[in-house]
Amino acid sequence: MADESNTGSIAAAVAPNADVKAPAAKKKRSPRRQKAVAEPRRAVSETPAAKPRRYSEQQRKEKLKLIETQVTEGKVTLKDAIKSAGISEQTYYQWKRTVKPVEQKAEKRLPTGEELADLVRLEEENQRLRKLLAEKLRAENADLRKRLGLD
């Protein structure tokens, strides 16, 4: 308690530290950068989109044939052959799908007179063989029943 009444020594203790520095000014920050405005992404190539083009059936068949020959010769891959033909992969597969049914219909031909006669003869032989097989199986079943004593 004696120290509390002695205020002079405190003043003397504070006096030597009178050179206490004022708090340093805070470092100023630079203003925040604004967020970058997202620009819409463009296509990889800066060229304008290709104008839709119509190909005739003959042109389509030629391009498909060109692609097939390039691939079968082993010169390029299918993807590269399609690009070199100047069409997209989707177009290639659509064309290929539409050409196939037409070719399949063309491949089917009607049988001639000789072929019809052969077909009729084969069908008659087939019927005769089926009857023989059925008779043989019936006889075998009857024989087995007799042996087992079921009949």
Curated annotation (Swiss-Prot):
Annotated Pfam families: HTH_Tnp_1
Protein purpose: Seems to affect the transcription of cya3. May be negatively autoregulated.
Stretches for region Disordered: 1-61
Biased composition regions of type Basic residues, renumbered to the chain: 24-35
Gene: syrB2
Residue stretches of biased makeup (Low complexity): 11-23
GO BP of this protein: DNA transposition
InterPro entries associated with the record: Homeodomain-like_sf, Transposase_8
Presence of keyword Lyase: no
Record's protein name: Probable transcriptional regulator syrB2
Entry GO MF terms: DNA binding; transposase activity
Coiled-coil parts of chain: none
Keywords, in A-Z order: Nodulation, Plasmid, Repressor, Transcription, Transcription regulation
